[in-house]
Amino acid sequence: MQQLQNVIESAFERRADITPANVDTVTREAVNQVISLLDSGALRVAKKIDG
């Protein structure tokens, strides 16, 4: 999971330079995997508030 996070965060830092035509395979696969994990409920996005 940490590797996926690192790839996504690195891509986010380079977001102005990334297009669908030039995105590298590692980034594309990481994004697709995270989307699949979110869709299946294996991952979720949440913000911890007071707790």
UniProtKB/Swiss-Prot annotation:
Signal peptide: none annotated. One of its GO terms (molecular function) is 2,3,4,5-tetrahydropyridine-2,6-dicarboxylate N-succinyltransferase activity. It is found in: Cytoplasm. One of its GO terms (cellular component) is cytoplasm. The keyword Cell division does not apply. Gene3D superfamilies: Tetrahydrodipicolinate-N-succinyltransferase, N-terminal domain (1.10.166.10). Pfam families: THDPS_N_2 (PF14805). Its EC number is 2.3.1.117. Pathway: Amino-acid biosynthesis; L-lysine biosynthesis via DAP pathway; LL-2,6-diaminopimelate from (S)-tetrahydrodipicolinate (succinylase route): step 1/3. Its main location: cytoplasm. One of its GO terms (biological process) is lysine biosynthetic process via diaminopimelate. It comes from the Bacteria. It catalyses: (S)-2,3,4,5-tetrahydrodipicolinate + succinyl-CoA + H2O = (S)-2-succinylamino-6-oxoheptanedioate + CoA. It is an enzyme of class 2 (transferase). The keyword Cytoplasm applies. Keywords: Acyltransferase, Amino-acid biosynthesis, Cytoplasm, Diaminopimelate biosynthesis, Lysine biosynthesis, Repeat, Transferase. Belongs to the transferase hexapeptide repeat family. Homotrimer. This is 2,3,4,5-tetrahydropyridine-2,6-dicarboxylate N-succinyltransferase.
